[in-house]
Amino acid sequence: MDEFVTAEDLVHEYSVLQEPDSVVNWSRYIAAKRDDPCSVSWVYERCLQALPAQWEVWREYLQFRMRLLDGVCAVQHAAEFEKVNRLFWRCVEHNAAVVEAWRLFLGHAQRQGALALVRQVVDAALRGVGLAKHRTVWEDVVAYIEELLPAEETDLGEEQDLHELVRGALFGGAGAEDAGADIWSSAMLRRYIQVAEDAEAVLALLQRTHDYATVVAVYEKHVLPVTRAKHKGRQSYESQFRYLVALDHTGATAKLEDAVARCAQLFPERAPSLTIFLAKHYVKQGNYNRCTDVLTDSLKHTAKSSEFASLYDFLVVFEESLIEVVLEHLQEHPENEERWGADLERHTDQLDGLLADHALLLNDLKLRQEPDNVKHWLDRVELFDKAASKASVYADAIASINYKSQTVPGQLGTLWWQYAQLYIDDGQYETAKTILDKALNVPYNFLQDPELIWTKWAEEELKRAGLDAAMQVLSHALQIPDDHELLRDKFESHEKMPAQTVIFSSLKLWSFYIDLLEASSESDEHLERTKAAYEATIQLKIATPLLFVNYAHYLQDKGNHVESFSIYERAVDIFPAETAFEIWDIYIGEALKYGLPKEQIRDLFESSLKMANEGVECKPFFLLYAKFERDNGMIETAANILHRACRAAQTMDAKRSLWTLCLNWCRQELGGSYARALYEECIQALPNHVAVVYVLEYAKVEEGLKQVKRARALLQYGARLLHPANNADLWEYWELFELRHGNKDTYKDMLQLKRKVEELLEGDGLPVPNQIGNIAFVASTDGLQNPGGESTNINNDELELDM
């Protein structure tokens, strides 16, 4: 005692001797000795003998002793650590209910890596503290275990190299060995899961111990029953897959198969990867046939392209890997060829078949996705070479397809026809006709389907038996029922009427039928039958403009020109103006060629020109009409027609070309005086940038008529329409005009006007409004004649321009 007590300590000695239960006195004594570790420990020991249940003092003392071991190797200085261990045991003997004491002890034991001590401390702590504190103790243990265990494999074994897996299963030694199981950690976790709130989290940690037998046992005891009891069935995929991995490692094939099936039901999007996982398990077990069977069966049932691709690719790689591994082995051990020869040949055949059947397997997938898609069935037919196989596909298609779900016109009819064509090509025409009969009883959604079948059947009869047989087939199809309008209305209003009920309205069949009739004999009977067929299409309101034209031409070929023109008359009344335009073009051309009376032709032209009121550009008819009148010597009438054409033109290009033609025609045929009123109207009707061309042209006409003042007034007007920079032709002509007819004053006035126009239009560059209607031209010495031939009054007022 003397070695620890100094003269300065006597006061503290007296105080602790007088009051040994005073924590304050002991704390002061300890504080006075803080610079000497041995003395501090001596005082703490005396204090704790006096106050053995004082946890605060124990905590200070234990933390003080543990700080002394900071940075010290627990192995080299095991004795020192053991001293602290004994202190902890003394502490918890008197403070068993203090959970903080146990946690501090656990931390010290974990620092030493003493697993046996950790387990002893945990056992004692769980006995000492209350049940409510057990989870707190376990949290420290679990945290320690997490530090001990390796990180979890993110792929949980899904990405094992298949080549090495096959090699290891076949010949051993090549596959990677499982890491050793951490039995201590798995045992601790197995105890902890009984009180843990999140069993799946504990299972994830248990997986990292590689003690797969324990993983299986824990999952089946603590996770699976809870899931079933709550009727959830949806614990995380990762949790279930850890169970599968554990079953795989323990070789529990039967359990694994059941678990994979259950997991695939809960997580259907994971079905392909689960199938591949199970296939790998069979590879490890050496059960290659079962591996192939599972993959092949999955290929036949999957309905997703991505799943199909992953399964197919894995199966191909498996077969390739197995063949490659066996070949490598035989290169090193040729004496084993007899042992592996049969297996090698079988798997080579399986690989060849798998590659050869890829298109067929892919088609199977498409048909599972869209069993009513006719195109997929037609594609499937092309995958077979033998007629019997093709016929089987057609039969399967017909039995499988839902006719009501069809959305592509003509596809279903194509399927039926190709089915019949198969027997036709094989010389079994009667069987083919039986198939066609059945095909025509199918409730198609679209007219194109029965239409195709009737057309193909008639074409086949035409090749085999001639025109009459083909016409007989078509006439049967085209029988018009009395209530044809009602049937068509119901079909077109989508009242679930099969297309076969309105086959009589097929323009394609009628056109084919008419072609056959026209190709038949020249008898009057056939003439009437042909006309009746044409009339039927008109009655059914399915006749096209081309059909009307063909009808008219047919009658012309038979010498019935007048009757053919009546067909044109009916056609132009039926179709809208845009369509009737083409018919009128043909009609008028043929009427002119045939030489109808002039008045009748004029009536045709006038009727055709009514289309202009409906917005149709009738320029060709106006020109043809004008030419007709000119050829008949009606010059002014032709001019009037061209004038009407200018007014009726729909586009600017048409207006310009027609005004140019009209004005040139009038000048040449009727003289410049006649053209004056037309020029004035033309300039009014066209925008400034176009009208200025005609103003200049008009001025030249007036100059030619010696009307200098009128020509100058026109030039003055035209000069104001555009900026001089955009009106160079007019200004150039005007300058020469003044040199020919003017004087100094008129030339000066011209230049003055040019400056004013430049100033006026320089700002925005826009032309002035066209005001030709407000201009009174200088009087002409000639009387004016309008296009209608009537004399116009002379305007005696000169033009005054506001300069």
Swiss-Prot record:
<dbReference type="GO" id="GO:0071014">
    <property type="term" value="C:post-mRNA release spliceosomal complex"/>
</dbReference>
<dbReference type="InterPro" id="IPR003107">
    <property type="entry name" value="HAT"/>
</dbReference>
<dbReference type="GO" id="GO:0005829">
    <property type="term" value="C:cytosol"/>
</dbReference>
<keyword id="KW-0677">Repeat</keyword>
<feature type="repeat" description="HAT 9">
    <location>
        <begin position="559"/>
        <end position="593"/>
    </location>
</feature>
<dbReference type="InterPro" id="IPR055430">
    <property type="entry name" value="HAT_Syf1_CNRKL1_C"/>
</dbReference>
<feature type="repeat" description="HAT 8">
    <location>
        <begin position="525"/>
        <end position="557"/>
    </location>
</feature>
<keyword id="KW-0539">Nucleus</keyword>
<dbReference type="Pfam" id="PF23233">
    <property type="entry name" value="HAT_Syf1_CNRKL1_N"/>
</dbReference>
<dbReference type="InterPro" id="IPR056350">
    <property type="entry name" value="HAT_Syf1_central"/>
</dbReference>
<dbReference type="InterPro" id="IPR055433">
    <property type="entry name" value="HAT_Syf1-like_N"/>
</dbReference>
<comment type="similarity">
    <text>Belongs to the crooked-neck family.</text>
</comment>
<feature type="repeat" description="HAT 11">
    <location>
        <begin position="633"/>
        <end position="668"/>
    </location>
</feature>
<feature type="repeat" description="HAT 2">
    <location>
        <begin position="35"/>
        <end position="67"/>
    </location>
</feature>
<feature type="repeat" description="HAT 3">
    <location>
        <begin position="79"/>
        <end position="111"/>
    </location>
</feature>
<dbReference type="Pfam" id="PF23231">
    <property type="entry name" value="HAT_Syf1_CNRKL1_C"/>
</dbReference>
<dbReference type="InterPro" id="IPR045075">
    <property type="entry name" value="Syf1-like"/>
</dbReference>
<dbReference type="GO" id="GO:0000974">
    <property type="term" value="C:Prp19 complex"/>
</dbReference>
<comment type="subunit">
    <text>Associated with the spliceosome.</text>
</comment>
<dbReference type="GO" id="GO:0000398">
    <property type="term" value="P:mRNA splicing, via spliceosome"/>
</dbReference>
<feature type="repeat" description="HAT 4">
    <location>
        <begin position="113"/>
        <end position="147"/>
    </location>
</feature>
<protein>
    <recommendedName>
        <fullName>Pre-mRNA-splicing factor SYF1</fullName>
    </recommendedName>
</protein>
<dbReference type="InterPro" id="IPR011990">
    <property type="entry name" value="TPR-like_helical_dom_sf"/>
</dbReference>
<keyword id="KW-0508">mRNA splicing</keyword>
<keyword id="KW-0747">Spliceosome</keyword>
<dbReference type="Pfam" id="PF23220">
    <property type="entry name" value="HAT_Syf1_M"/>
</dbReference>
<keyword id="KW-0507">mRNA processing</keyword>
<feature type="repeat" description="HAT 1">
    <location>
        <begin position="3"/>
        <end position="34"/>
    </location>
</feature>
<feature type="repeat" description="HAT 6">
    <location>
        <begin position="427"/>
        <end position="463"/>
    </location>
</feature>
<feature type="repeat" description="HAT 10">
    <location>
        <begin position="596"/>
        <end position="631"/>
    </location>
</feature>
<feature type="repeat" description="HAT 13">
    <location>
        <begin position="708"/>
        <end position="740"/>
    </location>
</feature>
<dbReference type="GO" id="GO:0000349">
    <property type="term" value="P:generation of catalytic spliceosome for first transesterification step"/>
</dbReference>
<dbReference type="GO" id="GO:0071004">
    <property type="term" value="C:U2-type prespliceosome"/>
</dbReference>
<dbReference type="GO" id="GO:0071007">
    <property type="term" value="C:U2-type catalytic step 2 spliceosome"/>
</dbReference>
<dbReference type="GO" id="GO:0071008">
    <property type="term" value="C:U2-type post-mRNA release spliceosomal complex"/>
</dbReference>
<feature type="repeat" description="HAT 7">
    <location>
        <begin position="482"/>
        <end position="519"/>
    </location>
</feature>
<feature type="repeat" description="HAT 12">
    <location>
        <begin position="670"/>
        <end position="704"/>
    </location>
</feature>
<dbReference type="GO" id="GO:0071006">
    <property type="term" value="C:U2-type catalytic step 1 spliceosome"/>
</dbReference>
<feature type="repeat" description="HAT 5">
    <location>
        <begin position="393"/>
        <end position="425"/>
    </location>
</feature>
<comment type="function">
    <text>Involved in pre-mRNA splicing and cell cycle progression.</text>
</comment>
